[in-house]
UniProtKB/Swiss-Prot annotation:
One of its GO terms (molecular function) is ATP binding. InterPro entries: AAA+_ATPase, ABC_transporter-like_ATP-bd, ABC_transporter-like_CS, ABCG_transporters, P-loop_NTPase. One of its GO terms (cellular component) is membrane. Signal peptide: none annotated. PANTHER family: ABC TRANSPORTER G FAMILY MEMBER 28, PROTEIN SCARLET. This is ABC transporter-like protein ECU11_1340. Residues 15-257 form the ABC transporter domain. It is found in: Membrane. The keyword Transmembrane helix applies. ATP binds at residues 47-54.
Length: 582
């Protein structure tokens, strides 16, 4: 089995300074960290709070705060990390995690894994998920409970179940496992069980397992092969975990309390202002000096905004996200609440007809426009700033392209449902007949409202995933604007022509007369006759486009209109008198 290596070479991380009392633009969290890790071993990252252990783990995973500066290199098997291969080479589970209230534990784990590994079969995903829930984490009995109805410790285990399921699916292929405090909030017995599982997994899968821990008990500590102890963003020790106390002894630092107090001694030693830190202040300064001498020359820092964005979505992942979102919105009644507006609007029109005895198609069209504007200002689903979308996209579970496409799918389906209810009510009360079909405008309003809402939210939050895509798209549009200006103007003109001019409103005789008068007035003779012929054909083509497009839209209407199958005359498209645009 091939051996894998993970190398950190002078890794440096500066993040935007949040300290308002400081004039420094950046705060350094990792300072020239160099370390080598080998497969088949479990490495514990330890240190006091703020020492940089979690930040180092996140940096290895590529989770760098926006606007940060980075330096150094992170190599896997001697090569820079490949973003496309990251989901299949790395597994990352963080300390805080997140929950999705309306999903069950089983759904929470399942949708995460299938989005992360779309090529895996559903059967195999469920098999490994069952093994984790039932045998490893002991939460099989709550698998059908909603996430919001279980305890904090159970939510912690549900988050772990996602990472552990992925680990089992990629056993033998996974190169690096990153876990941020997986044993926190767990009882000692389960924590020890997980420690032993990670040690065994590293051996049989030949993976590099990196785990942050705060203050483990002696038994859990003994399950770790090696230790990286950090202080103030710097490496203090990297080597066998059992030898750390001996290492400190060689530097003149001794624990007089015995082996059973080693953990308390270590954290007292590196807590600023404590009795032990004052006692061994000079020795600690000497250790830090020696470690600084190992650092390589610091290279130019890069900004974290230099990130490529993939504009091609994974269709399977997008559909899974859309399905999950529809389930969530149905269970939290968001879909039901959103139906109130079209129902109210339809009933308002019905009331108006019977009170004022007057009604026009324009009133329905105005109501449709009002509904579309309402949906733009009151988005639902994935477009409504869902926290878990940010969390999952930050973890590279999917990209911005999948977010956009899944948003389009889920919100479009729900919007079509709303419009169907709207039309169903006014049709039932006789406000419209089967000769009035609005499919073209429904599609335009639905897609226009959905896309507009996404753009508005992207502009409002430029540092969000959607915001970055929007900004990148705008840059590309400006770069291509010169080449596309003519084509865009022509397309806009054709669209306006199709939308505004009804079919048959311009008789063929008038078109012929217009062409003849136009070219006669320009004095086109002799050498300009070719121009006259070409120009006449162009105008004829423009006048023909609305008919072609309307024929295509009629086919769509026959396929998708909710009342189509209840009306016999639609079976003959040539005889139908439906007008998709008014």
């Amino acid at each position: 089995m091939k051996q894998h290596t993970l190398q950190l070479e002078g890794v440096t991380l500066d993040v935007p300074n949040q300290n308002l009392s400081s004039n420094e633009k950046y705060a350094r969290l990792i300072n020239g960290l160099t370390a080598d890790f080998k497969s088949g071993n479990v490495y514990a990252f330890m240190g006091t709070s703020g020492s940089g252990k979690t930040t180092t783990l996140e940096t290895i995973a590529g989770l760098v705060p926006s606007g940060s500066r980075t330096g150094g290199r992170i190599l896997v098997d001697g090569q820079e990390r490949n973003p496309d291969e990251f989901p299949y080479e790395f597994a990352y589970g963080d300390q805080l995690g997140y929950i999705i209230d309306e999903l069950t534990v089983e759904e929470f784990v399942y949708y995460y894994v299938v989005s992360s590994l779309p090529e895996e079969s559903k059967e195999r995903v469920r098999e490994k998920m069952d093994e984790v829930l039932e045998n490893l984490l002991n939460i099989g009995h709550i698998r059908h409970n909603k996430m919001k109805n279980i305890s904090g410790g159970e939510q912690k285990r549900a988050n772990l179940a996602r990472t552990f399921t992925k680990m089992l699916l990629l056993e033998g292929e996974l190169k690096v496992v990153l876990l941020d405090e997986p044993t926190s909030e767990l009882d000692a017995g389960l924590a020890l069980k997980l420690g032993e599982f990670l040690r065994d997994y590293a051996r049989r899968s030949n993976s590099i397992v990196l785990v942050t821990v705060h203050q483990p008990g002696a038994e859990l500590y003994n399950t770790f092969d090696n230790l990286l102890f950090m202080n103030n963003g710097e490496k203090l020790y990297l080597g066998p975990s059992r030898d750390f106390i001996k290492f400190l002894g060689t530097k003149g630092i001794h624990n007089d309390g015995g082996p059973e107090t080693n953990m308390e001694f270590l954290f007292s030693l590196f807590t600023k202002g404590s009795k032990m830190s004052k006692k061994y202040e000079k020795q600690l300064e000497q250790i830090a000096k020696e470690m600084n001498e190992e650092k390589k020359e610091e290279k130019k820092l890069r900004t974290s905004d230099d990130t490529e964005i993939n504009f091609i979505p994974n269709l399977y992942v997008s559909f899974q996200m859309a399905i999950r979102q529809i389930i969530i919105d149905w269970r939290n009644r968001e879909i039901l609440y959103s139906l109130a507006m079209p129902i109210a609007m339809a009933l308002f029109l019905v009331t108006g007809k019977y009170i004022y005895k007057d009604f026009s198609i324009a009133t329905i069209k105005a109501s449709m426009l009002s509904l579309s504007l309402y949906y733009v200002m009151n988005p639902s689903g994935l477009m409504n700033d869902k926290h878990y979308v940010t969390e999952e996209s930050n973890r590279k579970l999917y990209g911005a392209a999948e977010v956009w496409f899944s948003s389009l799918i889920s919100d479009t389906l729900v919007s079509i449902l709303k419009y169907c209810i709207f039309f169903g009510i006014i049709y039932a009360f006789g406000l419209i007949s089967m000769d009035h079909a609005f499919l073209g405008q429904v599609l335009m309003y639905t897609l226009g409202g959905t896309v507009s809402s996404m753009l508005f939210r992207s502009m409002a939050s430029p540092l969000s995933t959607l915001g970055k895509v929007f900004n990148t798209t705008m840059v590309l549009m400006f770069q291509l604007s010169g080449a596309l200006l003519g084509a865009g103007a022509l397309l806009g003109a054709l669209t306006l022509w199709i939308s505004v001019i009804p079919e048959g409103s311009i008789p063929q005789e008038e078109i012929d007369a217009f062409i003849s008068n136009f070219f006669d007035s320009t004095g086109s003779t002799g050498s300009t006759s070719i121009f006259s012929k070409v120009g006449s054909w162009v105008i004829r083509f423009i006048c023909l486009v609305p008919k072609v497009v309307r024929s295509f839209l009629r086919i769509l209407f026959l396929m998708f209109h909710p009342f189509a199958f209840f009306h016999s005359s639609i079976l003959d498209a040539e005889k139908s008198s439906y007008k998709l645009f008014f």
